[in-house]
Amino acid sequence: MNLDALKLEICCAARFLYRAGMSAANAGHISVTIAEDRMLVNRFGPSFATMHPADILTVDYNGRVLEHDPSVSPYVNDTINLHAVIHRYNPQIAAVLHTHPPAAVTWSTFHKVPEIYDQESCIIAGDIAIVEDEFEGIASSEDRVRPFAEALGKKPLVLLPNHGAITTGRDVRTAMVRMILLEGACARNISVAAAARATGMTPHAISQDHALTAKQELAKIPFLEPLWEDFLKRLRQSDPDLFTTKVAATA
């Protein structure tokens, strides 16, 4: 995939997450590695709702902007540096997505990995980690980010208590779908907890063994590409401005 197509894919993922109610203000970044020491990442400023390919910067792993559209301000904030550290520590990770989905943020306050209650959540069974014992403010230094990077070297999804979530993948669309699945799992945990409290009934989670077995079975279904195509069809209806640029021809 060429750089223009990668930039558009980042924007499509961001726009869809916004449409799905999974972004907060202009917080959140999506990055994808393009060389040994550089990545594409959205600049700070525009929200996921309005992101365009011109908002995507080429940044090295020290946070230096190497290329940017001359029409935009190439401001690099602490969160972009967070992505750089994660990529530097984990060269095997292609894409990194960080945002603040409401259910994931809510569930993260319990400092607990969500239970698996449904078939879809089995796809991410055993893939979720919790980082930090408590919220310690913005992760603005490499010492603070290192635990995130180390956790993501072992698990592709991480909950940041009282903050948000980070998902990774072999490409942007995989990281995005994992974020959607994580948000769904957290939402169901919240709903199940509320139902249990209201009814006095005891919920039953899917056992770890059964969840992992279902995960293996679901992995045989090639759902990602048709799902991504469905997302694009929806975006062409809801966000036609994103597909009027020259890079849209590569989507």
Predicted regions located by residue number:
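Glycine-rich flexible loops
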Residues: 1-251
